[in-house]
């Protein structure tokens, strides 16, 4: 018994008789861990044997009682030198296990504690009845039981449960007989009670009233019971139970109201053991308000009955009582000024690796009182913008960094080369076998070498080395070396000296030489022997550079490829000999193919420029110290993604050196080169490497724990020694040593989310390393990487001593943070590109067009509007944005395409005048195309100029032109005209690529980039990850827990992408690195465009962003123009035939019954959907203004349903008077008499859904003003319901395009149908479409039935839309022809009289390339056979068969018979 242990026994007054037992003979205290914050002491004891159960209980109870008096919690575990597996002792400890958490849970204890155990076949066997859930036991309880037995001193005990049939039958029999006896007794008792009751019952008239029931008293008792009730962990609930109490956090809430007016709150809670679905009913609104505390993020105590939900079929708690509880969050308890700074933290922008948003990371650090926190995501800086804004808001310094992948530019083939003829040299080709990868923690067990000259082995060296301990199973499995091999082996130092003698005057050769040489040098250093100084050739790098076309360059694949014998891979003698044979093959090829004859040439002439692609990656943390450093960081990120990307973004060391100004460099994690050197090469080597860095990082031992499992470090003591070595490295290299946390999530319980994300990557991912080989491989554990408080970090490093721990955790991290300057990540102003004379050009183009239309001098209303807009546009530097948009639109127009506008740009009259948009925002007006005389209607009586009656100019008699949609300029650039303009344009999808290239041409390729996006894991995808994790790792989660885990795993960065039409333009007097790094979308280095590294939204207020979107409408208009020769600009917006489509079908020559709809809206953009067709049927629009209203109502949120629809139905308002588009609010209120500023503000509040969110005082002020100006109450109430509104300019542009398309449907129908099917239709079924009306209607009916049963597929839903148009076309008397092998086009539908001929691409499964190939092949000659169609046309057998079935091929033979006789003619 050790003195320390004896002293402890004295303190707890352990009985002397127990102390004298043999088990206590060598008792000792291995370690005591003291957690100062939680006041927990962990004792680790060593005993000669497992303690008798009575002794164990006495020790346990006395330890607990003694320390409890000092308010200290105690836990302990035992390591026993000898273990007694007798059944009696195991049975006693088995029952004892259920007295310790977590095995003492009520359900586990009651179900399992009374079972019998035995020890058989090296296993603890639990005999259980057959109805026990074995899977649940294995998944939820077995791990805890194993850990408890290990703590008792039994070591890692294998525990299994078997079904005991005899026990099952016995318990079943007892249950049945017991139940029968109870039923019999209950019946008898009931009869006797009835007789006694009748005998005792007094006459009725003498009955006394029952005492009044005290409901308040009962409620108070229930509440008291609720307060004191035992909390049940959610994981324990497996069946229906009553009066269960949970405590946990709400993570999902949904409130519903039934038809009867009752309310139901469906919510989900978690206590982090599992999660549960719960329900709470409320009879009315008043009762519902009592449960406002049921909100997302709230911590509650709830009581209720667990029942199976009949709809979800899962266990659900019907809540009876609920109260909010205080949740004690982790806090940093260190005093102000003594708190650490976290300098290594990942956010959810670390691809598929970390969880916290940068906002939550910064908020947590600020809440804990930390003065700074660093962001160090893997190889990207996409969290910087949000981190910058959040840190400023939180009043904390954000340190901007990243964890980079550093590689050597050129990985040498030869180390320390000299001038030597390779053909005349002597080589020692060697290999070592070790017990692990760490030269400092693992041992050499074999050194073997072949000395070779001119390809011949002239001498061999082969020695085993006894490491002084048994080999692990993994080492033996990997190397084939057993303990028997090592018996009688020479001492290590003897073998090392002999090997050095063996290597004299030779070039050393090894495969992956950096490992072998590093291991040898570390051992030489340890034994005061000289390190390797002679030249070394690495055959791994030799092969990579000599044979870059090979995918694998390992020893095994290379020996197979070159047919070199390798009988026992991973035994040093065999590996060395095989490597030698390969060496001389390589030397021969290098000489013959590359002229390599001298050792010096290997590095100078053979190492490839792109050898960095194969170089081993080392992590380093890089931090921005100042503004210069920020720009350099952006350059490094860009270069790593654009120029040096290979699997991951890489930064070659010389590139880092060239951009190091303003940056600070840290050694990062266990994947850093300094840590690796400490582990594999020794402190001296690590010191040399550390000189390159600005500071050394050390991390909590828990972060390095996976290295123990991977056998890179022996144990906890080994981890602590590595940390001490790193501190020593810092001391010798004169570098600051900082303790960092390698944060990947914030709270300890969030570990499971990262586990799920990482495991979803599969075993091929580096982060998802495995232990073991083959089918037995298991995933390596992930480190405990939560955000630690200062106290927790000090506990982690307590082994260093109080002062040193405080220095590395607090003082040094604060010192480093003070060296970081504040930087501006996101600029505060807009920086537009420069175009020479942009302001003058915009003004000139505006007035030029205005004079052309309205005359010179201009009408006052036009002149004032232009002056107002130009003052804002030119004064705020927006002219270049207007001019750039005008240039792009003009170029597309010159290529023959119209460009539609989106959003509010049509609110700008200047935009109209310079040709950016067709929408004219002036009040409705007439203007004469001959003499420019004009008339404006400004009283609001007309909604659109297109609705004005036709009339001639009173001055010259020329028919007036009509225009004007009455849209205020404020809706585009804000009331003060200083909002950055967002000009969105709809280009034809066919012309979009050309428009994108126009941007490059105008501004320069080095200033134009696609707008980057970041794609994160969606909750549905995360749900799939959770289910996959369940499947792969034998887990079982209830539905609520799956939902929680999916929500926790969602939001992590998965990939990058690009906006479909967004292009960011950098000002030509700056460069892109002033704003953002750049990269390729989705890491596709073959992409033609680079994107912004930042999500474009993060910088859209700093640089010009052009939205050049592809749209079907301009494409369709161009197609119709090509077919008809009609200029779409000349199509009137008030054509009577077109307007008739909105009220009936007569203009199409069909009845509603024929086409299945009461109007002619099918296939008309904006109005062809079922939803909008329903709106048309209800409102019967007759004017362009009313169509604008419909467009606004259909695109808004809570504008039509439950709002305008009801007002129109009830006759309170009309389609004309309801609120439709956002701009109408401002115009209407101004006409009503409100001040423009207030009218604008009300419009802004309503359109953004803020009406009910602003203060009651502000809202009442607006309401009073509206009522004072006779705005009706229904209008005010309608404002309060709106969540989002559509801009009128957007609606006007879309409706105008729609009416042009509709014009062709009415007046040129076959052209319309040709364009529709060529451009808009998404799905085809040619057999049906060319089968006539009956076939089309039958298929539509079939899909309709499927839709009613929710069985229709997405393809069928798209097909139904297509068939509606086919049906209409056929009913109008046109025909749908069959696919024609010699007449059909590859892509476009063709018009042949009154018939449409479909293209090849319309055939299901036939792609564009094959379609074009068939057309090309038929131009070369007729297809003589199906075989020829397949061969020359590129059609698959399936496609040819499908064509044959449809009658397209006629009597075409299978193959060309004449070809059999070609040789005879």
From Swiss-Prot:
Protein keywords: Cytoplasm, DNA replication, DNA-directed DNA polymerase, Exonuclease, Hydrolase, Nuclease, Nucleotidyltransferase, Transferase
Per UniProt, residues of the Exonuclease domain are: 427-583
Q: Which reaction does it catalyse?
A: DNA(n) + a 2'-deoxyribonucleoside 5'-triphosphate = DNA(n+1) + diphosphate
Q: Name one GO cellular component term.
A: cytoplasm
Gene Ontology molecular function: any one: DNA binding
Q: What SUPFAM superfamilies does the annotation carry?
A: Nucleic acid-binding proteins, PHP domain-like, Ribonuclease H-like
Domain of life assignment: Bacteria
> Record keywords: Magnesium included?
no
Q: Does the keyword NAD apply?
A: no
InterPro entries with a match to the protein in the record: DNA_pol3_alpha_NTPase_dom, DNA_pol3_finger, DNA_PolC-like_N_II, DNA_PolC-type_N_I, DnaE2/DnaE/PolC, DNAPol_HHH, DnaQ, Exonuclease_RNaseT/DNA_pol3
| Known function | Required for replicative DNA synthesis. This DNA polymerase also exhibits 3' to 5' exonuclease activity.
State the family named in the UniProt similarity comment for this chain: Belongs to the DNA polymerase type-C family. PolC subfamily.
The molecule here is called: DNA polymerase III PolC-type
Q: Which organism is it from?
A: Streptococcus pyogenes serotype M4 (strain MGAS10750)
């Amino acid at each position: 018994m050790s003195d320390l242990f004896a002293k402890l026994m004295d303190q707890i007054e352990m009985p002397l008789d127990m102390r004298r037992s043999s088990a206590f003979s060598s008792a000792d205290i291995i370690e005591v861990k003291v957690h100062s914050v939680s006041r927990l002491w962990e004792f680790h004891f060593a005993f000669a044997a497992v303690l008798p159960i009575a002794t164990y209980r006495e020790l346990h109870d006395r330890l607990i009682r003694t320390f409890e008096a000092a308010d200290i919690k105690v836990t302990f575990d035992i390591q026993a030198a000898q273990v007694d597996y007798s059944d009696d002792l195991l049975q006693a400890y088995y029952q004892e296990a259920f007295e310790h958490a977590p095995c003492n849970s009520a359900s586990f204890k009651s179900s399992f504690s009374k079972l019998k155990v035995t020890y058989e076949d090296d296993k603890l066997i639990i005999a259980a009845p057959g109805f026990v859930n074995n899977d649940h036991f294995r998944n939820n309880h077995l791990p805890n039981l194993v850990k408890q037995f290990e703590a008792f001193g039994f070591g890692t005990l294998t525990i299994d449960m078997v079904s005991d049939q005899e026990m099952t039958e016995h318990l079943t029999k007892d249950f049945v007989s017991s139940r029968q006896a109870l039923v019999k007794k209950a019946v008898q008792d009931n009869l006797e009670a009835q007789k006694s009751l009748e005998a005792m019952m007094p006459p009725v008239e003498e009955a006394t009233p029952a005492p009044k029931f005290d409901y308040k008293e009962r409620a108070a008792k229930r509440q008291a019971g609720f307060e004191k009730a035992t909390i049940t962990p959610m994981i324990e609930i497996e069946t229906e139970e009553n009066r269960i109490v949970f405590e946990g956090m709400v993570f999902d809430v949904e409130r519903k109201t039934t038809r009867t007016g009752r309310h139901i709150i469906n919510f989900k809670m978690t206590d982090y053991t599992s999660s549960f679905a719960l329900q709470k009913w409320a009879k009315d609104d008043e009762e519902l308000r009592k449960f406002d505390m049921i909100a997302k993020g709230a911590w509650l105590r709830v009581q209720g009955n667990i029942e199976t939900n009949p709809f979800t079929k899962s266990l659900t708690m019907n809540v009876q009582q609920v109260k909010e509880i205080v949740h004690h969050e982790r806090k940093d308890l260190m005093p102000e000024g003594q708190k650490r700074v976290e300098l290594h933290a990942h956010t959810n922008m670390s691809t598929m690796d970390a969880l916290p948003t940068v906002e939550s990371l910064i908020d947590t650090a600020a809440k804990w009182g930390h003065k700074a926190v660093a962001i160090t995501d893997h190889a990207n800086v996409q969290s910087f913008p949000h981190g910058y804004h959040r840190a400023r808001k939180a009043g904390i310094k954000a340190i901007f960094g990243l964890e980079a992948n550093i590689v050597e530019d050129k990985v040498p083939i030869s180390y320390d080369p000299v001038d030597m003829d390779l053909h005349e040299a002597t080589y020692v080709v060697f290999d070592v076998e070790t017990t692990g990868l760490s030269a400092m923690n693992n041992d050499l067990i074999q050194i073997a070498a072949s000395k070779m000259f001119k390809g011949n082995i002239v001498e061999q060296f082969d020695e085993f080395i006894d490491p002084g301990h048994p080999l692990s199973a993994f080492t033996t499995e990997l190397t084939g070396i057993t303990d028997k091999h090592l018996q009688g082996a020479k001492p290590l130092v003897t073998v090392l000296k002999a090997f050095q003698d063996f290597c004299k005057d030779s070039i050393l050769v090894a495969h992956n030489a950096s490992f072998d040489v590093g291991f040898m040098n570390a051992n030489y250093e340890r034994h005061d022997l000289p390190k390797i100084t002679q030249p070394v050739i690495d055959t791994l790098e030799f092969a990579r550079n000599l044979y870059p076309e090979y995918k694998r360059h390992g020893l095994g694949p290379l020996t197979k490829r070159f047919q070199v014998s390798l009988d026992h891979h991973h035994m040093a003698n065999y590996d060395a000999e095989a490597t030698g044979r390969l060496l001389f093959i390589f030397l021969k090829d290098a000489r013959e193919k590359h002229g390599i004859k001298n050792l010096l040439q290997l590095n100078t002439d053979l190492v490839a420029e792109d050898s960095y692609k194969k170089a081993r990656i080392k992590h380093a943390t890089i931090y921005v110290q100042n503004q210069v450093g920020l720009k350099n960081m952006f350059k490094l990120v860009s270069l790593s993604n654009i120029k040096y990307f290979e699997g991951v973004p890489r930064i070659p060391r010389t590139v880092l050196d060239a951009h190091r100004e303003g940056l600070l460099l840290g050694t990062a994690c266990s994947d850093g080169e300094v840590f690796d050197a400490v582990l594999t090469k020794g402190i001296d080597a690590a010191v040399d490497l550390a000189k390159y860095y600005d500071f050394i990082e050390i991390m909590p031992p828990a972060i390095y724990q996976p290295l123990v499992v991977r056998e890179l470090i022996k144990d906890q003591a080994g981890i602590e020694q590595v940390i001490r070595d790193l501190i020593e490295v810092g001391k010798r290299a004169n570098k600051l040593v900082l303790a960092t946390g390698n944060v990947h999530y914030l709270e300890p319980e969030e570990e499971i989310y990262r586990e799920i994300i990482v495991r979803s990557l599969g075993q091929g991912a580096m982060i998802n390393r495995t232990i073991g080989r083959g089918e037995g491989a298991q995933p390596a554990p992930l480190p405990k990487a939560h955000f630690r408080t200062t106290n927790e970090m000090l506990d982690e490093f307590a082994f260093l001593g109080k002062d040193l721990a405080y220095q590395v955790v607090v003082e040094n991290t604060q010192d480093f943070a003070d060296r970081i300057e504040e930087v501006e990540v996101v600029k505060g102003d807009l920086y537009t590109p420069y175009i020479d004379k942009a302001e003058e050009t915009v003004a000139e183009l505006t007035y030029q067009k205005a004079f052309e239309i309205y005359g010179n001098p201009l009408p006052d209303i036009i002149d004032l509007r232009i002056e107002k807009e130009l003052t804002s546009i030119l004064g705020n530097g927006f002219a270049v944005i207007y001019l750039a948009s005008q240039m792009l639109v003009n170029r597309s127009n010159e290529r023959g395409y119209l460009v539609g506008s989106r959003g509010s740009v049509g609110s700008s009259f200047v935009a109209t005048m310079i040709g950016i948009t067709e929408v004219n925002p002036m009040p409705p007006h007439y203007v004469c195309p001959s003499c420019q005389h004009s008339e404006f209607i400004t009283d609001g009586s007309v909604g659109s100029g297109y609705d004005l009656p036709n009339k001639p100019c009173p001055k010259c008699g020329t028919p007036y032109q009509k225009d004007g949609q009455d849209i205020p300029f404020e809706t585009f650039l804000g009331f003060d005209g200083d909002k950055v303009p967002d000009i969105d344009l709809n280009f034809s999808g066919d012309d979009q690529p050309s428009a994108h290239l126009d941007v490059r041409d105008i501004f320069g390729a080095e200033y134009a980039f696609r707008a980057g996006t970041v794609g994160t894991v969606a909750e549905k995808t995360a749900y799939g990850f959770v289910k996959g994790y369940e499947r792969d790792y034998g887990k079982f989660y209830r539905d609520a827990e799956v939902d929680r885990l999916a929500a926790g795993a969602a939001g992590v960065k998965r990939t990058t992408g690009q906006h479909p039409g967004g292009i960011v333009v950098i000002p030509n007097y700056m460069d892109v690195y002033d704003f953002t790094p750049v990269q390729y979308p989705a890491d596709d280095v073959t992409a033609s465009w680079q994107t912004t590294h930042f999500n474009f939204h993060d910088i859209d207020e700093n640089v010009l962003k052009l939205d050049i979107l592809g749209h079907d409408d301009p494409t369709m208009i161009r197609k119709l123009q090509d077919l008809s020769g009609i200029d779409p600009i000349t199509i009137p917006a008030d054509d009577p035939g077109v307007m008739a489509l909105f009220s009936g079908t007569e203009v199409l020559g069909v009845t509603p019954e024929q086409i299945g709809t009461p109007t002619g809206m099918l296939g008309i953009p904006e109005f062809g959907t079922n939803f909008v067709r329903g709106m048309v049927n209800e409102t019967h629009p007759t004017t362009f203004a009313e169509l604008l209203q419909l467009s606004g109502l259909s695109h808004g949120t809570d504008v039509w349903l439950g709002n305008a629809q009801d007002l129109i139905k009830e006759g309170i308002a009309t389609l004309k008077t309801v609120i439709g588009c956002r701009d109408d609010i401002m115009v209407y209120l101004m006409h009503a008499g409100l001040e423009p500023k207030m009218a604008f503000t009300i419009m802004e509040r309503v359109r953004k859904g803020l009406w009910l969110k602003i203060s009651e005082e502000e809202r009442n002020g607006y309401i009073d003003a509206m009522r004072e100006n006779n705005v009706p109450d229904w209008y005010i109430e309608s404002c309060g319901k709106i969540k989002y509104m559509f801009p009128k300019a957007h609606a006007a542009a879309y409706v105008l395009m729609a009416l042009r398309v509709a014009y062709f449907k009415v007046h040129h129908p076959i052209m319309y149908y040709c364009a529709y099917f060529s451009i808009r239709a998404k799905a085809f079924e040619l057999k049906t479409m060319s089968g006539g009306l009956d076939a089309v209607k039958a298929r539509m009916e079939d899909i309709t039935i499927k839709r009613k049963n929710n069985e229709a597929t997405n393809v069928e839903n798209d097909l139904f839309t297509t068939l509606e148009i086919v049906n209409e076309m056929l009913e109008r008397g046109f025909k749908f022809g069959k696919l024609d092998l010699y007449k059909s086009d590859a892509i476009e539908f063709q018009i042949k009289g009154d018939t449409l001929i479909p293209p090849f691409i319309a055939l299901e499964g036939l792609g564009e390339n094959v379609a074009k190939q068939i057309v090309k092949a038929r131009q070369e000659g007729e297809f003589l056979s199906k075989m020829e169609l397949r061969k020359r046309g590129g059609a698959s057998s399936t496609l040819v068969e499908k064509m044959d079935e449809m009658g397209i091929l006629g009597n075409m033979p299978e193959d060309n018979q004449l070809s059999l006789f070609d040789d005879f003619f």
